[in-house]
Protein backbone atom coordinates (compact mmCIF):
# COMPACT_ATOMS: atom_id res chain seq x y z
CA UNK A 1 0.00 0.00 0.00
CA UNK A 2 1.23 3.49 -0.86
CA UNK A 3 1.86 5.61 2.24
CA UNK A 4 -0.13 8.57 0.95
CA UNK A 5 0.15 10.71 4.08
CA UNK A 6 3.93 10.71 3.85
CA UNK A 7 4.07 11.16 0.08
CA UNK A 8 2.29 14.49 -0.08
CA UNK A 9 2.11 17.28 2.50
CA UNK A 10 -0.75 19.71 1.80
CA UNK A 11 0.60 23.24 1.38
CA UNK A 12 -0.74 26.06 3.62
CA UNK A 13 -3.33 23.62 4.96
CA UNK A 14 -4.52 25.73 7.92
CA UNK A 15 -4.88 28.84 5.76
CA UNK A 16 -6.85 26.94 3.13
CA UNK A 17 -9.18 25.40 5.72
CA UNK A 18 -9.77 28.79 7.36
CA UNK A 19 -10.64 30.32 4.00
CA UNK A 20 -12.97 27.51 2.90
CA UNK A 21 -14.73 26.72 6.19
CA UNK A 22 -17.02 29.80 6.55
CA UNK A 23 -18.70 28.96 3.23
CA UNK A 24 -19.34 25.35 4.29
CA UNK A 25 -20.99 25.84 7.68
CA UNK A 26 -24.59 25.42 6.58
CA UNK A 27 -26.49 22.19 5.97
CA UNK A 28 -26.03 20.56 2.53
CA UNK A 29 -23.09 22.79 1.63
CA UNK A 30 -21.19 21.66 -1.46
CA UNK A 31 -17.48 22.16 -2.06
CA UNK A 32 -15.46 21.32 -5.15
CA UNK A 33 -11.79 20.44 -5.09
CA UNK A 34 -10.79 20.87 -8.72
CA UNK A 35 -7.34 19.38 -8.16
CA UNK A 36 -8.01 16.54 -5.74
CA UNK A 37 -4.62 14.86 -5.91
CA UNK A 38 -4.18 12.69 -2.83
CA UNK A 39 -7.00 14.52 -1.00
CA UNK A 40 -4.89 16.09 1.74
CA UNK A 41 -6.76 19.38 1.58
CA UNK A 42 -10.15 17.80 0.93
CA UNK A 43 -9.99 15.51 3.95
CA UNK A 44 -9.34 18.55 6.14
CA UNK A 45 -12.23 20.45 4.53
CA UNK A 46 -14.69 17.61 5.20
CA UNK A 47 -13.49 17.13 8.77
CA UNK A 48 -13.92 20.84 9.46
CA UNK A 49 -17.35 21.01 7.79
CA UNK A 50 -19.29 17.90 8.92
CA UNK A 51 -22.44 18.90 7.01
CA UNK A 52 -20.70 19.46 3.69
CA UNK A 53 -20.28 17.23 0.67
CA UNK A 54 -17.24 17.47 -1.57
CA UNK A 55 -16.77 16.75 -5.26
CA UNK A 56 -13.15 15.86 -5.97
CA UNK A 57 -11.98 16.25 -9.56
CA UNK A 58 -8.71 14.89 -10.91
CA UNK A 59 -7.47 13.91 -14.36
CA UNK A 60 -4.93 11.47 -12.87
CA UNK A 61 -6.81 8.20 -12.40
CA UNK A 62 -4.14 6.73 -10.12
CA UNK A 63 -4.29 9.70 -7.74
CA UNK A 64 -8.09 9.60 -7.82
CA UNK A 65 -8.11 5.96 -6.76
CA UNK A 66 -5.68 6.57 -3.92
CA UNK A 67 -7.71 9.56 -2.75
CA UNK A 68 -10.92 7.50 -2.73
CA UNK A 69 -9.22 4.79 -0.65
CA UNK A 70 -8.01 7.42 1.78
CA UNK A 71 -11.49 8.92 2.13
CA UNK A 72 -12.80 5.45 2.92
CA UNK A 73 -10.21 4.94 5.65
CA UNK A 74 -11.03 8.36 7.14
CA UNK A 75 -14.75 7.54 7.26
CA UNK A 76 -15.60 10.33 4.81
CA UNK A 77 -16.57 8.35 1.71
CA UNK A 78 -20.31 8.97 2.15
CA UNK A 79 -19.75 12.72 1.67
CA UNK A 80 -17.19 12.43 -1.12
CA UNK A 81 -17.84 12.22 -4.86
CA UNK A 82 -14.73 11.39 -6.94
CA UNK A 83 -14.75 12.46 -10.59
CA UNK A 84 -12.19 11.55 -13.25
CA UNK A 85 -12.00 14.68 -15.39
CA UNK A 86 -9.88 17.70 -16.16
CA UNK A 87 -10.83 20.66 -13.99
CA UNK A 88 -11.83 22.77 -16.98
CA UNK A 89 -14.83 20.42 -17.29
CA UNK A 90 -16.23 21.87 -14.05
CA UNK A 91 -19.48 23.05 -15.64
CA UNK A 92 -20.15 19.64 -17.16
CA UNK A 93 -19.25 17.81 -13.96
CA UNK A 94 -21.80 19.85 -11.99
CA UNK A 95 -24.47 19.71 -14.70
CA UNK A 96 -24.17 15.92 -14.93
CA UNK A 97 -24.90 15.73 -11.20
CA UNK A 98 -27.80 18.18 -11.23
CA UNK A 99 -25.91 20.80 -9.23
CA UNK A 100 -26.50 24.43 -10.21
CA UNK A 101 -24.55 26.29 -7.52
CA UNK A 102 -21.83 25.39 -5.02
CA UNK A 103 -20.47 27.05 -1.90
CA UNK A 104 -16.71 26.82 -2.32
CA UNK A 105 -14.22 25.93 -5.04
CA UNK A 106 -10.61 25.02 -4.28
CA UNK A 107 -7.66 24.65 -6.63
CA UNK A 108 -4.12 23.58 -5.74
CA UNK A 109 -2.22 24.01 -8.99
CA UNK A 110 0.99 22.31 -7.91
CA UNK A 111 2.07 18.87 -9.04
CA UNK A 112 1.47 16.24 -6.41
CA UNK A 113 4.49 14.56 -4.91
CA UNK A 114 3.14 11.29 -6.33
CA UNK A 115 3.46 12.67 -9.86
CA UNK A 116 6.89 14.19 -9.25
CA UNK A 117 8.29 11.07 -7.63
CA UNK A 118 6.78 8.55 -10.05
CA UNK A 119 9.77 7.68 -12.22
CA UNK A 120 7.92 6.71 -15.40
CA UNK A 121 5.96 9.97 -15.82
CA UNK A 122 8.88 12.25 -16.71
CA UNK A 123 7.79 15.25 -14.62
CA UNK A 124 11.12 15.52 -12.81
CA UNK A 125 14.52 16.36 -14.22
CA UNK A 126 16.14 14.70 -11.19
CA UNK A 127 16.08 11.19 -12.64
CA UNK A 128 15.91 9.61 -16.08
CA UNK A 129 12.44 8.72 -17.36
CA UNK A 130 10.41 8.64 -20.57
CA UNK A 131 9.47 12.08 -21.90
CA UNK A 132 5.79 11.76 -21.05
CA UNK A 133 4.61 14.52 -18.64
CA UNK A 134 0.90 13.72 -19.03
CA UNK A 135 -1.27 14.17 -15.97
CA UNK A 136 -3.95 12.12 -17.73
CA UNK A 137 -2.22 9.20 -19.44
CA UNK A 138 -5.22 8.66 -21.73
CA UNK A 139 -4.41 11.90 -23.56
CA UNK A 140 -2.32 11.55 -26.76
CA UNK A 141 0.03 14.53 -26.49
CA UNK A 142 3.35 13.85 -24.72
CA UNK A 143 6.56 15.79 -24.26
CA UNK A 144 8.28 13.33 -26.59
CA UNK A 145 5.75 14.08 -29.31
CA UNK A 146 6.23 17.83 -28.88
CA UNK A 147 10.00 17.55 -29.19
CA UNK A 148 9.60 15.37 -32.28
CA UNK A 149 6.99 17.40 -34.16
CA UNK A 150 6.90 21.06 -33.14
CA UNK A 151 8.92 23.33 -35.39
CA UNK A 152 11.53 25.71 -34.00
CA UNK A 153 9.13 28.67 -33.84
CA UNK A 154 6.58 26.68 -31.81
CA UNK A 155 9.28 25.46 -29.43
CA UNK A 156 10.59 29.00 -28.96
CA UNK A 157 7.10 30.22 -28.14
CA UNK A 158 6.34 27.63 -25.48
CA UNK A 159 9.80 27.90 -23.87
CA UNK A 160 9.54 31.69 -23.79
CA UNK A 161 5.86 31.98 -22.83
CA UNK A 162 5.50 29.03 -20.47
CA UNK A 163 9.06 28.74 -19.16
CA UNK A 164 10.21 32.37 -19.35
CA UNK A 165 13.43 30.86 -20.67
CA UNK A 166 16.04 33.41 -21.72
CA UNK A 167 17.75 30.99 -24.13
CA UNK A 168 14.57 29.75 -25.84
CA UNK A 169 15.86 30.24 -29.39
CA UNK A 170 19.17 28.54 -28.76
CA UNK A 171 17.51 25.57 -27.06
CA UNK A 172 14.86 25.22 -29.78
CA UNK A 173 17.45 25.30 -32.56
CA UNK A 174 19.55 22.69 -30.75
CA UNK A 175 16.53 20.41 -30.31
CA UNK A 176 15.61 20.57 -34.00
CA UNK A 177 19.20 19.90 -35.05
CA UNK A 178 19.62 17.02 -32.59
CA UNK A 179 16.35 15.23 -33.36
CA UNK A 180 17.35 14.79 -37.00
CA UNK A 181 20.14 12.53 -35.76
CA UNK A 182 18.51 10.96 -32.71
CA UNK A 183 14.94 11.28 -31.39
CA UNK A 184 14.34 12.57 -27.87
CA UNK A 185 12.83 9.81 -25.76
CA UNK A 186 14.14 10.38 -22.21
CA UNK A 187 14.49 13.22 -19.74
CA UNK A 188 18.23 12.57 -19.50
CA UNK A 189 18.67 13.38 -23.20
CA UNK A 190 16.85 16.69 -22.78
CA UNK A 191 18.80 17.48 -19.63
CA UNK A 192 22.09 16.95 -21.43
CA UNK A 193 21.12 19.14 -24.37
CA UNK A 194 19.99 22.06 -22.19
CA UNK A 195 23.13 21.70 -20.10
CA UNK A 196 25.21 22.06 -23.26
CA UNK A 197 23.27 25.07 -24.57
CA UNK A 198 22.75 27.31 -21.52
CA UNK A 199 25.95 29.19 -20.57
CA UNK A 200 27.22 28.58 -17.05
CA UNK A 201 27.27 32.31 -16.26
CA UNK A 202 23.55 32.74 -17.05
CA UNK A 203 21.99 29.74 -15.34
CA UNK A 204 19.18 30.05 -12.79
CA UNK A 205 19.54 28.45 -9.39
CA UNK A 206 19.13 24.69 -9.58
CA UNK A 207 18.89 22.62 -12.73
CA UNK A 208 19.27 24.67 -15.95
CA UNK A 209 16.54 22.57 -17.58
CA UNK A 210 13.82 23.35 -15.03
CA UNK A 211 12.21 26.09 -17.13
CA UNK A 212 12.16 23.91 -20.23
CA UNK A 213 10.56 21.07 -18.25
CA UNK A 214 7.96 23.49 -16.86
CA UNK A 215 7.15 24.78 -20.33
CA UNK A 216 6.76 21.29 -21.77
CA UNK A 217 4.55 20.17 -18.88
CA UNK A 218 2.29 23.21 -19.28
CA UNK A 219 2.03 22.61 -23.03
CA UNK A 220 1.38 18.88 -22.73
CA UNK A 221 -1.43 19.40 -20.24
CA UNK A 222 -2.78 22.75 -21.48
CA UNK A 223 -2.45 23.99 -17.93
CA UNK A 224 -2.75 27.76 -18.37
CA UNK A 225 -5.64 27.57 -20.82
CA UNK A 226 -7.43 25.12 -18.54
CA UNK A 227 -6.86 27.44 -15.57
CA UNK A 228 -8.11 30.48 -17.48
CA UNK A 229 -11.20 28.49 -18.50
CA UNK A 230 -11.93 27.08 -15.05
CA UNK A 231 -11.78 30.32 -13.05
CA UNK A 232 -14.81 31.90 -14.78
CA UNK A 233 -16.71 28.61 -14.60
CA UNK A 234 -16.09 28.52 -10.85
CA UNK A 235 -17.24 32.12 -10.37
CA UNK A 236 -20.45 31.52 -12.30
CA UNK A 237 -21.23 28.45 -10.18
CA UNK A 238 -20.71 30.03 -6.75
CA UNK A 239 -23.56 31.17 -4.52
CA UNK A 240 -23.40 34.67 -3.09
CA UNK A 241 -21.12 34.16 -0.09
CA UNK A 242 -19.32 31.38 -1.92
CA UNK A 243 -15.54 31.30 -1.99
CA UNK A 244 -12.87 30.66 -4.61
CA UNK A 245 -9.54 29.61 -3.10
CA UNK A 246 -6.50 29.04 -5.34
CA UNK A 247 -2.89 28.02 -4.68
CA UNK A 248 -0.42 28.66 -7.52
CA UNK A 249 3.26 27.84 -7.74
CA UNK A 250 4.81 29.86 -10.54
CA UNK A 251 4.40 33.39 -11.81
CA UNK A 252 2.36 32.51 -14.90
CA UNK A 253 -0.30 30.75 -12.83
CA UNK A 254 -0.34 33.49 -10.22
CA UNK A 255 -0.69 36.22 -12.85
CA UNK A 256 -3.66 34.38 -14.35
CA UNK A 257 -5.37 34.00 -10.97
CA UNK A 258 -4.60 37.56 -9.87
CA UNK A 259 -5.85 39.03 -13.15
CA UNK A 260 -9.09 37.06 -13.03
CA UNK A 261 -9.87 37.98 -9.44
CA UNK A 262 -9.06 41.64 -10.09
CA UNK A 263 -11.98 41.83 -12.54
CA UNK A 264 -14.45 41.43 -9.69
CA UNK A 265 -12.56 43.52 -7.15
CA UNK A 266 -12.71 46.83 -8.98
CA UNK A 267 -15.46 49.27 -9.88
CA UNK A 268 -16.67 48.55 -13.41
CA UNK A 269 -17.03 52.13 -14.71
CA UNK A 270 -14.72 54.68 -16.33
CA UNK A 271 -12.71 56.77 -13.89
CA UNK A 272 -14.18 60.13 -12.88
CA UNK A 273 -17.89 59.33 -12.81
CA UNK A 274 -19.52 61.24 -9.93
CA UNK A 275 -21.90 58.38 -9.06
CA UNK A 276 -21.16 54.67 -9.27
CA UNK A 277 -24.26 52.63 -10.26
CA UNK A 278 -25.02 49.65 -7.98
CA UNK A 279 -24.52 47.25 -10.89
CA UNK A 280 -20.97 48.54 -11.35
CA UNK A 281 -19.86 47.84 -7.78
CA UNK A 282 -17.29 45.07 -7.16
CA UNK A 283 -18.75 41.56 -6.87
CA UNK A 284 -15.73 39.95 -5.20
CA UNK A 285 -14.25 40.58 -1.75
CA UNK A 286 -10.51 40.00 -1.37
CA UNK A 287 -10.04 37.53 1.49
CA UNK A 288 -6.25 37.35 1.43
CA UNK A 289 -5.36 41.00 0.70
CA UNK A 290 -3.03 39.95 -2.06
CA UNK A 291 -1.33 36.59 -1.70
CA UNK A 292 -0.44 34.46 1.30
CA UNK A 293 3.01 32.85 1.20
CA UNK A 294 4.49 29.97 3.17
CA UNK A 295 6.54 30.99 6.20
CA UNK A 296 10.05 29.74 6.94
CA UNK A 297 8.77 26.93 9.18
CA UNK A 298 6.51 25.47 6.49
CA UNK A 299 9.22 25.80 3.85
CA UNK A 300 11.65 23.94 6.12
CA UNK A 301 9.12 21.14 6.65
CA UNK A 302 7.91 21.09 3.04
CA UNK A 303 10.36 22.68 0.55
CA UNK A 304 7.81 22.44 -2.26
CA UNK A 305 5.81 25.18 -0.51
CA UNK A 306 8.52 27.79 -1.12
CA UNK A 307 6.93 29.22 -4.27
CA UNK A 308 3.25 29.00 -3.29
CA UNK A 309 0.92 31.99 -3.61
CA UNK A 310 -2.52 31.59 -2.06
CA UNK A 311 -5.32 33.91 -3.20
CA UNK A 312 -9.01 33.83 -2.30
CA UNK A 313 -12.14 35.84 -2.98
CA UNK A 314 -15.74 35.70 -1.80
CA UNK A 315 -18.70 36.42 -4.08
CA UNK A 316 -20.13 39.43 -2.28
CA UNK A 317 -23.23 40.01 -4.44
CA UNK A 318 -24.93 38.64 -7.52
CA UNK A 319 -22.48 38.69 -10.40
CA UNK A 320 -23.95 40.99 -13.09
CA UNK A 321 -25.35 39.22 -16.14
CA UNK A 322 -22.87 40.90 -18.49
CA UNK A 323 -20.02 39.47 -16.44
CA UNK A 324 -21.62 36.02 -16.33
CA UNK A 325 -21.97 36.12 -20.10
CA UNK A 326 -18.36 37.23 -20.48
CA UNK A 327 -17.17 34.46 -18.16
CA UNK A 328 -19.17 31.86 -20.10
CA UNK A 329 -17.78 33.00 -23.44
CA UNK A 330 -14.21 32.94 -22.11
CA UNK A 331 -14.60 29.43 -20.71
CA UNK A 332 -16.19 28.07 -23.88
CA UNK A 333 -13.53 29.59 -26.13
CA UNK A 334 -10.67 28.19 -24.08
CA UNK A 335 -12.32 24.78 -23.79
CA UNK A 336 -12.42 24.65 -27.59
CA UNK A 337 -8.66 25.24 -27.62
CA UNK A 338 -8.09 22.48 -25.10
CA UNK A 339 -10.19 19.98 -27.05
CA UNK A 340 -8.21 20.71 -30.21
CA UNK A 341 -4.87 20.81 -28.43
CA UNK A 342 -5.30 17.52 -26.58
CA UNK A 343 -5.85 15.72 -29.87
CA UNK A 344 -2.97 17.15 -31.87
CA UNK A 345 0.53 18.55 -31.51
CA UNK A 346 -0.62 21.94 -32.75
CA UNK A 347 -1.82 23.29 -29.41
CA UNK A 348 0.66 26.17 -29.57
CA UNK A 349 -0.54 27.32 -32.99
CA UNK A 350 -4.22 27.02 -32.07
CA UNK A 351 -3.76 29.01 -28.87
CA UNK A 352 -1.67 31.66 -30.57
CA UNK A 353 -4.30 32.20 -33.27
CA UNK A 354 -7.15 32.50 -30.77
CA UNK A 355 -5.21 34.98 -28.64
CA UNK A 356 -4.34 37.04 -31.70
CA UNK A 357 -7.99 37.29 -32.71
CA UNK A 358 -8.92 38.43 -29.21
CA UNK A 359 -6.27 41.11 -29.24
UniProtKB/Swiss-Prot annotation:
Native organism: Bifidobacterium longum subsp. infantis (strain ATCC 15697 / DSM 20088 / JCM 1222 / NCTC 11817 / S12)
Role this protein plays: Specifically methylates the N4 position of cytidine in position 1402 (C1402) of 16S rRNA.
NCBIfam families: 16S rRNA (cytosine(1402)-N(4))-methyltransferase RsmH
EC number: 2.1.1.199
Family per similarity comment: Belongs to the methyltransferase superfamily. RsmH family.
UniProt name for this protein: Ribosomal RNA small subunit methyltransferase H
Lineage: Bacteria, Bacillati, Actinomycetota, Actinomycetes, Bifidobacteriales
Designated gene of the protein: rsmH
Any single Pfam family the record assigns to this protein: Methyltransf_5
Binding-site positions, S-adenosyl-L-methionine: 39-41, 58, 87, 108, 115
Residue stretches in coiled coil: none
InterPro entries for the chain: RsmH (IPR002903), SAM-dep_MeTrfase_MraW_recog (IPR023397), SAM-dependent_MTases_sf (IPR029063)
Amino acid sequence: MVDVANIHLPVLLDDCVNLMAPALEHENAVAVDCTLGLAGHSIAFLKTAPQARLIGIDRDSEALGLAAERMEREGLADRFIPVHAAFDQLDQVLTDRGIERVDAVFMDLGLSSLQIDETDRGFSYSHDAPLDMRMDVSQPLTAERILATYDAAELVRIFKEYGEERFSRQIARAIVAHRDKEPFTTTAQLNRLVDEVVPQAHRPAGNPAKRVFQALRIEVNGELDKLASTLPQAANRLHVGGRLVVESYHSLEDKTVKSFMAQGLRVDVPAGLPVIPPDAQPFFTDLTRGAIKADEHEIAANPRSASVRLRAVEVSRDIPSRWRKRFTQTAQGLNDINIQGSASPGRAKNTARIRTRRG
